[in-house]
């Protein structure tokens, strides 16, 4: 069908010129929220690894205001436009083009299985010891770099790359906390 294997990232991807639709049956999972937009960014921060205690880069997928989402409650029929931007967590089912793009940027943010969640999602790995760094500590735990309740101006999250191309995935959408956190990221999204 045209998929390619990246042995370093240990992931299958579909090159840009190949139609991704035939591959969805192999990458589709559960009933998470589906998100889509015409652009997205790769955000980066640093944390200390829980295992080796060395500083390591961590990554997250950010999408600006106006992204569309639908949930299992929508019966998969109604897309709602968001008035806020978001950093996604527990991301699964990214488009193959997006997976290939992420694999070309970093080998430490990749699809891997979580014993806690019971399925694979795009998770971070320590750059020194390869320990899995789960999304709870990064997105849901107070003090995590992608946790939205930072005081204005205190986040160290950088927008590394912005892509003006179709984006779609399944994952958890975060709202609330300090809207200025999202506003700052959105400004970085458009200036990257």
Spans of features found by a protein language model:
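Short metal-coordination and nucleic-acid-contact micro-motifs, chiefly zinc-binding Cys/His arrays
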Residues: 42-45, 119-122, 147-148
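Short cysteine/histidine-rich metal-coordination sites, predominantly Zn2+-binding motifs
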Residues: 64-75, 139-152
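Short linker/helix segments within small regulatory modules
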Residues: 64-66, 111-121, 140-142
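Short, intrinsically disordered, charge-biased short linear motifs at domain edges
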Residues: 32-40, 108-117
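Accessory DNA-engaging acidic/polar modules
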Residues: 1-57, 61, 65-102, 188-192
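Short, non-ligating residues that shape and space the ligands of small metal-coordination modules
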Residues: 58-59, 132-136
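Cys/His-coordinated zinc-binding microdomains
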Residues: 53, 127-130
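Polybasic, proline/glycine-rich intrinsically disordered low-complexity segments
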Residues: 141-192
């Amino acid at each position: 069908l045209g998929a390619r294997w990246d042995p370093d990232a240990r992931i299958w991807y579909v090159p840009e010129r190949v139609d991704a639709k035939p591959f969805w049956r192999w990458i589709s999972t559960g009933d998470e929220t589906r998100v889509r937009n015409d652009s997205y960014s790769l955000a980066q921060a640093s944390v200390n690894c829980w295992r080796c205690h060395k500083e390591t880069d961590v990554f997250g997928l950010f999408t600006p205001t106006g992204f569309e989402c639908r949930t299992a409650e929508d019966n998969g029929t109604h897309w709602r436009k968001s008035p806020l931007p978001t950093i996604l967590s527990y991301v699964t089912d990214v488009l193959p083009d997006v997976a290939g793009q992420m694999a070309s940027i970093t080998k430490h943010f990749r699809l891997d299985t979580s014993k806690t969640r019971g399925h694979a999602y795009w998770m971070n790995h320590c750059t020194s010891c390869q320990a899995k760094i789960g999304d709870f500590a990064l997105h849901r735990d107070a003090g995590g770099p992608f946790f939205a309740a930072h005081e204005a101006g205190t986040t160290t999250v950088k927008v590394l790359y912005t892509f003006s191309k179709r984006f779609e995935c399944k994952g958890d959408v975060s709202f609330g906390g300090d809207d200025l956190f999202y506003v700052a990221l959105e400004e970085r999204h458009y200036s990257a």
